[in-house]
Amino acid sequence: MSGSKGVSPPGYAAQTAAAPASRGGPEHRSAWGEADSRANGYPHAPGGSARGSTKKPGGAVTPQQQQQQQRLASRWRGDDDDEPPLSGDDPLAGGFGFSFRSKSAWQERGGDDCGRGSRRQRRGAAGGGSTRAPPAGGGCGGGSAAAAAAAGGTEVRPRSVELGLEERRGKGRAVDELEAGAVEGGEGAEDGGSSADSSNGPGAVLSLGACCLALLQIFRSKKFPSDKLERLYQRYFFRLNQSSLTMLMAVLVLVCLVMLAFHAARPPLQLPYLAVLAAAVGVILVMAVLCNRAAFHQDHMGLACYALIAVVLAVQVVGLLLPQPRSASEGIWWTVFFIYTIYTLLPVRMRAAVLSGVLLSTLHLAIALRTNAQDRFLLKQLVSNVLIFSCTNIVGVCTHYPAEVSQRQAFQETRECIQARLHSQRENQQQERLLLSVLPRHVAMEMKADINAKQEDMMFHKIYIQKHDNVSILFADIEGFTSLASQCTAQELVMTLNELFARFDKLAAENHCLRIKILGDCYYCVSGLPEARADHAHCCVEMGMDMIEAISLVREVTGVNVNMRVGIHSGRVHCGVLGLRKWQFDVWSNDVTLANHMEAGGKAGRIHITKATLNYLNGDYEVEPGCGGERNAYLKEHSIETFLILRCTQKRKEEKAMIAKMNRQRTNSIGHNPPHWGAERPFYNHLGGNQVSKEMKRMGFEDPKDKNAQESTNPEDEVDEFLGRAIDARSIDRLRSEHVRRFLLTFREPDLEKKYSKQVDDRFGAYVACASLVFLFICCVQITIVPHSMFMLSFYLACFLLLTLVVFVSMIYSCVKLFPRPLQSLSRKIVRSKMNSTLVGVFTITLVFLSAFVNMFMCNSKDLLDCLAAEHNISVIHVNACHVVESAFNYSLGNEQGFCGNSRPNCNFPEYFTYSVLLSLLACSVFLQISCIGKLVLMLAIELTYVLIVEVPRVTLFDNADLLVTANAIDISSNGTSQCPEHATKVALKVVTPIIISVFVLALYLHAQQVESTARLDFLWKLQATEEKEEMEELQAYNRRLLHNILPKDVAAHFLARERRNDELYYQSCECVAVMFASIANFSEFYVELEANNEGVECLRLLNEIIADFDEIISEDRFRQLEKIKTIGSTYMAASGLNDSTYDKVGKTHIKALADFAMKLMDQMKYINEHSFNNFQMKIGLNIGPVVAGVIGARKPQYDIWGNTVNVASRMDSTGVPDRIQVTTDMYQVLAANTYQLECRGVVKVKGKGEMMTYFLNGGPPLS
């Protein structure tokens, strides 16, 4: 039942071989580009017709591609397991192709689907199959199927962490933005809720209920469900929040100093007022120093924020209670300032900001109501104040919410990028470990370098062959394995081989031997590869001794009489891989052939060596004559003198003891346990439980429970730990200085700036809506406080209609399906263009600003001082507030009738124009997509325009208001007497107005700079994380594609799975598999080692071309059900029906496909003979039946198939006739039923099977 032993020396006729079960190889783009590299956003193809390709039409590698190759090369990860990592000199990027044939050759013989004139399409990989039990009979379809468990590999990814924010996935525009290079962030809602800012992309229809829920979500404090993630988020933005807090403290100090200056400018001074403000300045300065110390921790941030809120509240109370003269409009500007800065610059959650804003507003209103209760006009002032504070709080919410959502989304996306990168890195490390366990490092390195480098046109495929002199080759065969296999089920057979060869792999590593291949029950390895060793013969002899000891333990545990027959020869080898598909590292040379016959002519339990090997041993072992020629015709024919090892000498024993002691000391000094090399399920069927026997522990196997403990790592904790380290290492100042210009805040690299400018802000419609809401509040304020006029109503109505239109068009972008295509197109042009959206934003802000002051021109502009001077017949400079009180005319704040003969109404509260302008400045800050420089220019324009109006044409409005406020205070304090008491005066409004507007412009600019700086740094970090993730995914894709050319995809997925049970083995029972062996019968006559042909390398080059042609044929779409198993010397092995996707139980198409492939190989060999002037003869054998497929070698896996079907197929090849295809009776019945042309050969004597009736396949079904 075991697969027959085959060897790789040229000309050796393989009897049977093991076989992988699933397709691999360099598939066409749809198999590898899209399936394996979809995460990168573009497929990888050999020629690079993919969307993201940087390859020029002529095939030249662009500088960008070379740079990408260098980046990828630097990211080639190492591995500290059984193989060292590939070096960083390995270039990894660009197109991927395993064939380096010239263009003319490709056009003639077919190639990839990469724009080179291909006639053949690469077929996709056949997936891993489910288990099919073999029937009891020998053929296909006979008998009942026995149940068997399939151990298919599944790819395990870290679960997605619910961060409490839902990503916005814009379907209609996402592809365009990705193609434009935009790195687009989404939004979401906190606490696992739905998105609060319309998390629906274009094409979504927003219901009224959803809008209401989204509106309510805005006022909820955002926090990640996991406290650990929340703390990580706070660490992520800690430095930025620290900078924002410092900035807020600076502007608060400025505001307090301005308030002190205003108070000190007009005596009498209020000492409590001065003391409180001075104390507030001192406290804030001390806090600023403490917050910028190295000891300041993120846990201190909350305390600092709430302490600052307490200071602001104290300033608010004192600032409203103590100053004189009192007015309900006093302190509005700093209250608005405090409210807005708490929302925007103070790093607190929404709930705390809202509570602080409401508390400040309530304090102002309560104090104004208490201290100004006697004012007849108090009601409209309070109403106006409520409107102003409400507007400020709403604008603060509209600014705070998208900023925090953007920050949290940036954190989420960065974490997801890091999570994906770490997952890709883990997979990549596993792939590299698996890759390096199958191919030696130097071979894999050379292949990857050639894959990613531009290849010159060559007439032949590149051959990966290296010549090594002075090596020792060991062949070992398990004698008695057939009797052992006959007592095992399919699963037990795989487990037994897995356990035994895993132990052999460990012994090979310990003895400095490189395992080459496992062929059935034959194991062979070489010492002196890839690095030369002077003691290569000693290593092989020690390896043989350890193998004999290991098999004795197996004999002891299983009770089956098994033993090892070991043959060793020293000489020269050619090592490498042949063909284009299913690469397996192998060695070729006449010395390899001799080593194989040394094993065949050896004795059980003994090490059989040649004279050449004995010469390298330097007398360290006692030997006796081997007489190998008596047991093997090849040794006799070539007069090979052989010896059998008896024992090592005393001197050698002492050397071994010394070496073992040094190894133990080195291991202890390193401080870690040696790597686990045991099989995945050590002799489980014999032990009957989870315990590992004493004998198995002696063989080096570990307890599965220990292995479970080693592998129990949490991917989420790894992601958080990595992100935490990255946050700690991130330098905000360094990132700013390296990538961002200091004042303009633009990226120094034009490409980065271009990518950033192409970002689309989905919230633009919300910005316009918020600015329009500010307009409505300004309208309400002015309608309440300013005398009405037809101009006011008509102007507001016109502005309202314009803003409604702008809001409507902007909001269409979020609900595109509801509106006609022209409106959709217009909305997209506005929102998706930064210039267009900025222009619309400026237009909206301009309308809001005009609505804030335009009514000034409808007010009475007569100078009250002139009127009073004329009335009292005094000079203007002598007029004061007492003259207003003593005037016969009703000059008061409550009188809106014109005076001094002017019919226009009086605007007695012009400071509300200033407050309206402040609201328009806040509306400017809402538009986060406008750059900070753009906002600064716009705000300066607003300030300059308004200040000019205040200081020149409408200055009398403010002078009159100052006079009337003082007169109102005198009138109230006089209690109706005729006396005019001493009174306090205020700083003139025409002086205060430019100062407070300048303070607001400065604060809003600092906030805009902070917002844009944060957004750009988030973009930069996320872009770097995304690029690293994509580079790792590209590297992973290249490794996966290379790996899939060595192992079937389902096998690779099984061994790459992160969470795999220790008792899980990979095996399948396949009920009807067609197996083919095709050998070049006379290749051994062609192969000679001469100096003229580079010691046989040129012979191997031709063999490589032949195998490459066969690989190209099997890649054709019509042969997609076929799977190349491997090559053994000059024998090509393939099978079909190994999994559900290739097995056709009813139509038997997989059997017919293998027969067609065999005939195609015959035709191809004739074509090769014509063009190479050779006379190669092929023998092909076919058989069908059940097989067992599985993986042996836990750390150096090799996919194999075993069974009588494989043995008989090999015999059909070895007993065949040159240039004929020999098939069994089972195969004949299927092909004859499908009208294939066959002839009976007759009865053939087959070794181990007796006499068998066989047939020749002459041709396919006749054409109808």
Swiss-Prot record:
The chain crosses the membrane at residues 245-265, 271-290, 301-322, 331-348, 351-369, 377-398, 766-786, 797-816, 839-859, 913-933, 938-958, 987-1006. Residues 472-599, 1074-1213 form the Guanylate cyclase domain. The gene is ADCY5. PROSITE patterns: GUANYLATE_CYCLASE_1 (PS00452), GUANYLATE_CYCLASE_2 (PS50125). The modification Phosphoserine is found at residues 99, 160, 669, 757. Residues 1-198 are annotated as: Disordered. Catalyzes the formation of the signaling molecule cAMP in response to G-protein signaling. Mediates signaling downstream of ADRB1. Regulates the increase of free cytosolic Ca(2+) in response to increased blood glucose levels and contributes to the regulation of Ca(2+)-dependent insulin secretion. One of its GO terms (biological process) is positive regulation of cytosolic calcium ion concentration. Mg(2+) 1 binds at residues 477, 521. Residues 25-37, 156-176 have a biased composition (Basic and acidic residues). This is Adenylate cyclase type 5. Residues 860-912 are extracellular. Its cofactor is Mg(2+); Mn(2+). The N-terminus is blocked. The modification Phosphothreonine is found at residue 1014. It catalyses: ATP = 3',5'-cyclic AMP + diphosphate.
